[in-house]
């Protein structure tokens, strides 16, 4: 196929793109661009792709296109760079937790965790994800049951406090 022979040209999700554009009235023309793929979506498993679609939907829902948000942009860049070499599902959930905080709705408050019945282990994982520094190695093993509990909690949190019904809710719970 053309995609296999020539590649995507860098115009795909999760690609760092630098471009030159000109404006003619309401129309923009891109005259040149260079790209660097941070996370190759074509190499993700179905389960991993679902998790990253969740991240895309989260960004679309909580970060208006008209408003620039450098923190969110840098956070996504770090997360994609790390995900290219580490556990992609874990990286997607970590960046989801951190993006919610940047959007101004912190899922890690004690009151919310109690109200939505997050276990002590879930609270600890939430705190670890919330404060994770993308430049460091992840040292702590993550139990699958606690990971799934936290993923379900984030879905409930977004629905209740973000007032958004995510189309990709449950993405982190998929197993094949």
Regions found by a protein language model. Name each.
Residues 1-176:
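Non-catalytic alpha-helical scaffolds and adjoining flexible linkers that form interface surfaces
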């Amino acid at each position: 196929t053309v995609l296999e022979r020539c590649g995507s040209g860098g115009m795909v999700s999760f690609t760092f793109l630098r471009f030159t554009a000109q404006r003619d009235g309401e129309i923009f023309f891109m005259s040149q661009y260079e790209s660097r793929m941070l996370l190759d979506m074509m190499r993700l498993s179905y389960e991993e792709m679902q998790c990253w679609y969740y991240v895309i939907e989260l960004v679309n829902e909580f970060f208006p296109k008209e408003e620039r948000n450098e923190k969110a942009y840098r956070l996504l860049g770090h997360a994609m760079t790390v995900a290219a070499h580490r556990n992609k599902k874990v990286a997607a959930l970590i960046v989801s937790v951190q993006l919610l905080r940047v959007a101004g709705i912190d899922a890690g408050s004690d009151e919310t965790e109690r109200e939505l019945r997050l276990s002590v282990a879930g609270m600890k994982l939430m705190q670890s994800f919330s404060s994770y520094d993308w430049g460091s190695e992840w040292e702590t093993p993550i139990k699958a049951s606690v990971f799934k509990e936290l993923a379900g909690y984030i879905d409930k949190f977004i629905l209740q406090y973000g007032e958004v019904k995510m189309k990709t809710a449950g993405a982190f719970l998929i197993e094949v």
